[in-house]
């Protein structure tokens, strides 16, 4: 008897005995199996009307709303199931999964931990907890859950994938590759395992391995857009830009997919290299539009960084600086030089030249200055006016603590250069705390700097979000150098 025949039989049974909630529950299951989601919800609700403590019916309704992408109703019904039965593992796990899918990591963690208390060795829960830890950058915690999985089932491929992901984010690419290879071996039909390993080979510039593995991928998944994307990237790496364009213009991904950002970015750079600026600019614009609408971009606010610049522009004026209390500074333990400038202005080239000198050491792009100034009293620039020697010594110590994470300052013959271009906006604070500090300002033609920032694939933060639009990049340049020049 097929599902539709079973539905008709159950309808007859319900008509004869309309108060048996089990029959409604079973009918709801059949409607779900035949993809009649709205009818299934309606019948499960009738089941609940007959037995209001039927937590399984609430769980099934929640899953149906999840399928219908009605997340709020799904969450509400999972919570109703849990309220009736606080130890109902399925609903607790499912609710954790919903929160994970919508990137509510705090709530997903709470529900997965509760699920684990009920079924301690539930592998999907352990794996999802690891994903939560990865997304909240608690990598060691993530490894703990993944190693627990491997003790239970050493052939669970997603655990190795996620271990690889952790090492990817930690920039330990060789360990990343080892674990991605294990995932491929254990799950040879899963395109995602191959995709991850291709990405790791590309990131680590292991182009021979990248090329050889790509040949295998093309045999297994000849028409897969991800494989074609990597074929285009490899052609780009081999400077075959026209072939890259041919590869990448015949595929596309969902606009919310990071692969679509990557595809447009490589097309932009390829057109740039073959001197077709209009096409290049078009694809750079598309890349940035996609980035601006990505999930990651929602975590950042370009206006916050602009406001930080404007706040300093408004404060560091002669009228305010004239009010500063005179201080008898003690000699700093550090002989400090700051390498600053607008991004893409040549600071990396200067870094390469300077670090070739045996008596120069570069601390590259570390948050030494921002950590220090975050400790200024009440984070208020006006407190620089009457700052005390004790407060200055405290701030210097905070800087030195960060400094010593990367270099030992005991050798007085060494010149240490703190290189972070956008420290240019903190020069006022730096000079109030280290009046003997020196600055190397890297300058490039403004048009080149701004355009280069617009074309660059920066990791997004509040500052870098200003480079997704060329007019925002221009305004940022103008405001920063107005601050510098005043």
Predicted regions span which residues?
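PAPS-dependent sulfotransferase catalytic domain
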Residues: 170, 204, 224, 238, ...
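PAPS-dependent sulfotransferase catalytic core
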Residues: 259, 269, 282-395
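Conserved alpha-helical positions within TPR/SEL1-like repeat arrays
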Residues: 22-32, 56-67, 90-101, 124-135, ...
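Structural marker of alpha-solenoid helical repeat scaffolds
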Residues: 16, 50, 84, 118, ...
């Amino acid at each position: 008897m097929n599902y539709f025949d079973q539905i008709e039989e159950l309808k007859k049974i319900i008509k004869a005995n309309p108060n048996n909630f089990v029959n409604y529950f079973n009918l709801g299951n059949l409607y779900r199996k035949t993809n009649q989601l709205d009818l299934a919800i309606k019948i499960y609700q009738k089941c609940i009307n007959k037995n209001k403590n039927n937590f399984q019916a609430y769980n099934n309704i929640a899953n149906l709303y999840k399928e219908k992408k009605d997340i709020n109703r799904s969450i509400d019904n999972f919570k109703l199931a849990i309220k009736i039965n606080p130890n109902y593992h399925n609903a607790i796990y499912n609710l954790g999964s919903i929160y994970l899918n919508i990137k509510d990591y705090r709530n997903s963690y709470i529900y997965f931990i509760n699920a684990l208390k009920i079924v301690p060795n539930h592998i999907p829960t352990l794996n999802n907890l690891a994903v939560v830890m990865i997304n909240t950058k608690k990598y060691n915690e993530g490894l703990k859950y993944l190693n627990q999985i491997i003790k239970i089932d050493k052939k669970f491929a997603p655990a190795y994938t996620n271990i690889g992901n952790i090492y990817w984010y930690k920039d330990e690419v060789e360990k990343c590759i080892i674990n991605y290879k294990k995932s491929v071996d254990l799950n040879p039909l899963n395109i995602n395992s191959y995709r991850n390993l291709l990405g790791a080979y590309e990131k680590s510039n292991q182009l021979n391995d990248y090329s050889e593995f790509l040949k295998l991928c093309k045999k297994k998944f000849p028409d897969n857009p991800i494989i074609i994307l990597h074929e285009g990237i490899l052609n780009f790496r081999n400077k075959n830009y026209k072939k890259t364009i041919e590869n990448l213009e015949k595929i596309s991904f969902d606009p919310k997919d990071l692969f679509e950002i990557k595809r447009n970015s490589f097309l932009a750079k390829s057109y740039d290299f073959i001197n077709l600026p209009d096409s290049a600019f078009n694809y750079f614009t598309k890349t940035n539009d996609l980035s601006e609408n990505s999930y990651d971009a929602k975590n950042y606010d370009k206006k916050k960084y602009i406001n930080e610049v404007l706040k300093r522009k408004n404060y560091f004026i002669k009228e305010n600086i004239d009010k500063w209390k005179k201080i008898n500074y003690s000699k700093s333990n550090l002989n400090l030089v700051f390498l600053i400038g607008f991004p893409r202005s040549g600071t990396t080239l200067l870094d390469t030249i300077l670090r070739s000198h045996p008596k120069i050491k570069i601390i590259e792009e570390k948050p030494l200055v921002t950590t220090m100034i975050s400790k200024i009293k009440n984070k208020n620039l006006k407190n620089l006016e009457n700052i005390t020697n004790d407060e200055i010594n405290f701030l210097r110590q905070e800087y030195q603590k960060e400094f010593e994470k990367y270099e030992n300052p005991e050798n007085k013959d060494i010149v240490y250069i703190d290189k972070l271009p956008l420290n240019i906006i903190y020069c006022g604070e730096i000079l109030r705390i280290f009046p003997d500090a020196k600055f190397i300002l890297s300058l490039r033609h403004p048009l080149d700097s701004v355009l280069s920032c617009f074309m660059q694939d920066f990791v997004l933060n509040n500052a870098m979000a200003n480079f997704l639009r060329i007019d925002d990049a221009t305004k940022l340049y103008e405001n920063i150098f107005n601050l510098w020049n005043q």
